[in-house]
From Swiss-Prot:
Family matches, as InterPro entries: Mit_carrier, Mitochondrial_sb/sol_carrier, Mt_carrier_dom_sf
Keywords: Membrane, Mitochondrion, Mitochondrion inner membrane, Repeat, Transmembrane, Transmembrane helix, Transport
Annotated TM spans: 19-36, 76-96, 108-126, 160-184, 210-226, 280-297
Segments annotated as Solcar repeats: 13-95, 105-190, 203-305
Main location: mitochondrion
Protein name per Swiss-Prot or TrEMBL: Mitochondrial thiamine pyrophosphate carrier 1
Membrane topology, from the record: Multi-pass membrane protein
Protein source organism: Candida glabrata (strain ATCC 2001 / BCRC 20586 / JCM 3761 / NBRC 0622 / NRRL Y-65 / CBS 138) (Yeast)
Pfam family, one: Mito_carr
GO terms under cellular component: mitochondrial inner membrane
Organism lineage string: Eukaryota, Fungi, Dikarya, Ascomycota, Saccharomycotina
Annotated family: Belongs to the mitochondrial carrier (TC 2.A.29) family.
Amino acid sequence: MNKKDHLRKDEEVSTTNSLVAGSLSGLFARTCIAPLDTVKIKLQVTPHNKNANVLINILKREGIRGFWKGNVPGSIMYIIYGGAQFGSYTYIGSFLRGGLDLNISPQLYSCLVGSLAGMTSSLASYPFDVLRTRFAANSQGQLIKLRDEIMAIWSHEGLMGFFSGCGSSMINIGLNTAIMFGVYESIKIFTEERSKLSDRRDPFTLLNELAGPISGFTSKLATFPLDTVRRRIQIRNSPNEERHDREFTKDIYKSYKNRRFLGVGISMVQQEGPLSLYRGVTMSLIKSVPSTAISLWSYELFMNKLG
């Protein structure tokens, strides 16, 4: 457990290397979890369906390639998001160390910097997140071109269509990354300190290795309701409603019209019950735990390779 931790407070890390390593880790994570991401989004935006029904419907209507629906904007989003997240984490950390004398613990430092990095990466990659959501929500088997979807959003909603729900997303992602980096570094620091005081290293070595999955599980579970609401907001004004599984949910989506984030959340609870905020949470955890672990692990791997 004596390897360099590139996310630790006071570590001197190249912002350029962090940007490159973050982009590569984002692409690597996306490649591994794309099918799970598609199913998770389907569950979030389609009321009343169950996991098994979604899986069967995708296979029947779209075939196996349906699980990679929106993979191009999804991959671009993960590359931009990963690069912006880790690159801004390093840059913001360097700025705070140089311009401010923050007398805070490494754990709190990770929460603060992680939150700012999360909001930065969310804003930078958000248009592709909107595209990814609309591609994944599409229930028809025919191939949709990225250019056509971009032009449809531009024609019907204008520039702001690519940033639908962006404000709430930045809060959601900021909170998510604050928890993720905070828990990750807390576990790393705890295990390193305990291993120095104990002759039995194995339990702490295992916990150290599980820092990524645990941080992913904790952050996703804590912020999932916010993520579900923002997914609904992202497709409520979609110019291609007929593509989505919304034949029996049009009245539900009409009730979201002109409502802000909190209003949509309240409407979901009133019409579908409190558990609607956690629709797809099982699939999300199955996706997010390995995704976060892969992202953090591969980031450290690429950083070590880049020197």
